[in-house]
Amino acid sequence: MENSRIVQKGKDLTKGHQWFQKFSTFFSRIYSTELNPMYNLGGISVLLFAIACISGIYVFIFYNINPRHAWDSVEAMSNNVFNGWMRSIHRYSSDLLVIFILIHLLHTLLTSKFKRLVSWVSGIISFLVVILIGVTGYMLVWDQKAKLTGYLTAKLFSSLPIFDASIAGAFLLNDLDVVGGFFKVALFGHIVFSLVTIIIIWVHVLRISKPKIFPPKKLVYYVIIALDIIAIAFPVKSDPPAQASNLPISTTFDWYYYFGYYLMKLFSVNTNWLILIGSGVVLSIIPYLIKRKNNPPAFIDLDKCNACNLCAYDCPYEAIDMLQVEGKRKAILDPDKCVGCAICIGSCDEHAITHPMFPDLVVMPKPKSDVTVFSCSYFPEPELPSELNIQRYRVPCTGSIMPKDVQRMLENNTEKVAILSCEDCYYRLGKTWTINRFLRKRAPLFSKKFDASLVQLLTLTQYSKEKLLAFSKETVSEEGGSGEINIGDHKKGNPVWSVLIMTLFFALMIPLSSTTVRFFNPAEKTLIVNFKYISSPTEYEQFGSGAAHMQVKNPAVKRRSPVTLKIFSSKDKKLIFEKEYEPRGLRHDIAMFIFTQLVVDEDAVDVVLTETAFPDKQYKLDNIKLKQGDGTFVILRDDKLIVADKQGF
């Protein structure tokens, strides 16, 4: 037996793509390779986004944008069978969108496809924008979860100079005069960010030829049916309205959108900013952190190019354009876009394209081998049957195999040809183009003069040396004929099981979308002092000349007095808290926001607000009873300190 000759150029490639296919083949057996959800992660993500948008438009028809009536309108919607079903579809499609984006991101990392910088960065941005869409959407319900969202968001931004911490207190107090503006911003952001996402998706696939925007039609049906089932079986419910209590003690928590907010429970605000910015930067620069040498680009001999346009049409990454060169139309390759897949070699009947990693094929007459094996660079080292005389070539992608070369091999030096391919092509289209060429559906066609049944394609998860041996021993019909290529792949799925498994997967995500999380301890006594205060002026700025008749009657305030907030125990008058607040503005001449949030062990406290420059001007409220759970709010109303109720009065 002649030893197998392996022609391999370049370095070994990542094992991540191989591992992912071995994991995903379970779903191929049920769905088929074409409909495998793991091979359509991006398409399913776009589909879920489209479903969320369509259902969101419908839900918006019945939504009252006034925050005082928002919860009631959502509740009325939920109490209607069809409207409630549409709301559930909107909610679950949004949650699943995050899940599939994350799986898509992990798949990209695992298979080292993040080197395409534009696609990677736009993907990261789209994930962040989707999170913003979800958070603003939850705000619009204006239930206890919305109140908690507003409070945590305001608390996070309070560390920035242009935001004040008192906004967090306004959310807790349900002060719609203050937070009503933020409510409108949330509504505006929810709509605008959705439109921005469409642009980001376009950028994401900008440099990809023939992108799969949506999954195959049957898979679309499976997703919609599964989504409909869980929306009917598990209708979405709101938390109690925001006005129901001051502190959102116990709220449902959607981990898919709120995972970042949980860090507010564990770390300080500044630490959360470091985590937020740091993780965003690290994700964005992963293509630079993890070095992976790309395949060299292909080379086109313009003297041989006959301008057939097939290479430009077949390139998965739009790296080839047909341009005028010295008055003649030629194929011009952009090396910055080329990933070195060499699929263009399989497109060129004129052998005008070469690649450093493509082997030198023996097509001339010689003693025939039993099987000639082509394996793609992402196919693991195959175990070959020792009893066969095998000629083996390793190519960058099976899409680089030219039908004309296979014809010459079958004619001159081999009995049969086996092609070992990825189940899901690393370069997207290589496997598809190869099959279609040998099925005579895509140029360059495999000639009808040759029997295509002498060629077999086996995917990574289908290959075994026993199958290769059986293929080599298969007899060919003596009647002749063009035959058809043998394809070892998962071609047929089970629609019923496909829908059931997808429904089960969708249902398993529901618990994480509505777990109960507490950011406030119901056993603690929380005191919150929150109000706007304009202190007395300490300096004035006089405009005009020194003449009395030139002076203005109401001079401008140049500076105002700071104030000091003190909190004492009503029992023993022990000082619990003291803080000085400065008026805002560059000249300290603008109103200030008084805000503090304390957990106090006392049963009652006294609150005293004193103007530093005018000690006689003082506001005092004694013997404020503190209660567990819902908290106690002290506000300034009608020029006196009072304890607010749940409605902010």
Regions found by a protein language model. Give the residues of each.
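Membrane-embedded alpha-helical bundles of multi-pass integral membrane proteins
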Residues: 20, 30-38, 42-61, 72-90, ...
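Iron-sulfur cluster-binding cysteine motifs and their immediate structural context
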Residues: 310-361
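Iron-sulfur-associated redox domains of electron-transfer enzymes in respiratory
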Residues: 138, 149, 360-486
